[in-house]
Amino acid sequence: MITSVNNGQVKNIIQLNQKTKARREQGLFVAEGRKMFGEAPADWIEKVYVSETLTSDPVLMEQVEKLPYDIVEDSVFRQMSDTQTPQGILAVLRRPSYTLEDILGGKNPLVMVLEDLQDPGNAGTILRTGEGAGVSGVLLTRTCVDITNPKVIRSTMGSVYRMPFLYVESVV
């Protein structure tokens, strides 16, 4: 059990939550909450962290125990979390790597292009809306918000797992 905020894993998760550079360098990002954990592709998950309180949920723990995981003392988990009221579960995931072919390769692709979009909540909502509209993938300019920002991840409500995305230098 992890019992200290000085634990290296805890420090790293805090960095992944706060720093785009850390997410890019490590190729990892954090997704919090039951829904985001439940929808995450298993092959993206590097490790799961569960608060001590949540270990009493047998259904959740049955899912968690199939993956690498650690139990975290509740007070430490609150420090790791990017949200005001943590749900008690977070996953560190490997950032997927997509190509232009992944986005344009299907029959009659519908591509969404985002240029200079800065607000994380708006970015996630737009991705979610795009998925609902049948978008096959997203191209983002390098000046857009980091799609693995925790606020973007939360606001996609899982769409980020199902829709390929690629950063490009320019859209022209």
Which residues does each PLM region occupy?
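Short, aromatic/basic amphipathic alpha-helical patches
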Residues: 56-66
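Glycine/small-residue-rich loop that forms an oxyanion/phosphate-binding "nest" at active or ligand-binding sites
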Residues: 64-94
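Acidic/glycine-rich phosphate/pyrophosphate-binding loops and surrounding catalytic core
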Residues: 84, 88-108, 144
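Short acidic-hydrophobic, aromatic-tinged amphipathic segments that line or gate anion-handling sites
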Residues: 1-4, 70-73, 164-171
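Boundary-proximal intrinsically disordered activation/regulatory segments immediately upstream
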Residues: 1-58, 144-145
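RNA substrate-binding interface of SAM-dependent RNA methyltransferases
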Residues: 103-172
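A short acidic, often aromatic-flanked loop/helix-cap motif at beta-alpha or helix-coil junctions
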Residues: 56, 74-80, 170-172
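Structural motif
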Residues: 30, 49, 90-92, 111-113, ...
